[in-house]
Design a protein with these regions (language model features):
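Conserved N-terminal catalytic core of the sugar/cofactor nucleotidyltransferase
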Residues: 1-46, 60
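Short beta-strand-to-loop acidic/aromatic patch adjacent to the donor-nucleotide binding site
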Residues: 44-55
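Conserved donor-nucleotide/metal-binding helix-loop-beta segment in metal-dependent transferases, i.e.
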Residues: 57-80
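Short, glycine-/small-residue-rich phosphate/pyrophosphate-handling segment
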Residues: 80-111
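Conserved alpha/beta core of the MobA/IspD/sugar-nucleotide pyrophosphorylase nucleotidyltransferase superfamily
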Residues: 99-148
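Short, Lys/Arg-enriched N-terminal segment that forms or immediately precedes the first helix
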Residues: 145-159
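Short alpha-helical "packing" element that flanks the helix-turn-helix/winged-helix DNA-binding module
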Residues: 169-170
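Short helix-boundary/capping micro-motifs
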Residues: 177-181
Length: 182
């Protein structure tokens, strides 16, 4: 989007791979979804997709989705379909080939694999953060649920020579076949 460079600068030290839709002004959100799916295809068994304004679902919701055994699933809270959406790798080609009418929701409705809707008690799955007040309320709820380990590995001789930044550089160099593009 229009703030991609700013977001990338703020998040660059977090081990994130950034993908851009350079035609964001003239395309739909589903086109951006497809860019991400193309990149992730065959790199993992399942992915979890969420729009940027629905970031604060809980780890418990993620575990419920992953443990469901479904190839296509989403959480339901307060009678509403939410995020993240679980998509198995084998469904990515079908979604990429979809016409895009009604976006990802339409593609899931047309998918040959039925969507499993799973009830969860997690308001973060259905409430977006469009305003500062929305975001503050979601952050408060999310932080009350938050417990997570953080692990970092580096190799050191006299000075550290391999850390998460070098690992990311090597991953991106392998992906792009270019240090410059990485």
């Amino acid at each position: 989007g229009c703030n991609a460079a700013v977001l990338e600068r703020h998040l660059s030290g977090n081990g994130i791979i950034f993908l851009r839709n350079e035609q964001y002004e003239t395309t739909q959100m589903f086109d951006s979804v497809k860019i991400g799916l193309r990149y992730l295809q065959d790199k993992c068994d399942k992915i979890l997709f969420t729009p940027v304004d629905v970031p604060l679902f809980t780890a418990q919701t993620v575990n419920i989705l992953l443990d469901s055994g479904a190839a296509l699933a989403c959480p339901m809270c307060e009678g509403k379909q939410g995020h993240p959406i679980l998509i198995a790798n084998e469904l990515i080609p079908e979604i990429l080939d979809d016409c895009g009418e009604m976006g990802l929701k339409g593609a899931m409705d047309r998918c040959t694999t039925p969507l499993l809707r799973i009830d969860v008690d997690d308001p973060g799955t259905v409430h977006d953060a469009d305003t500062p007040e929305d975001f503050s309320a979601l952050v408060d709820y999310h932080n009350s649920q938050l417990v997570r380990p953080v692990v970092s590995v580096s190799l050191t001789k006299e000075k550290p020579f391999f850390d998460s930044k070098i690992a990311m550089l090597l991953t991106l160099t392998d992906e792009t076949k270019s240090v410059r593009a990485a």
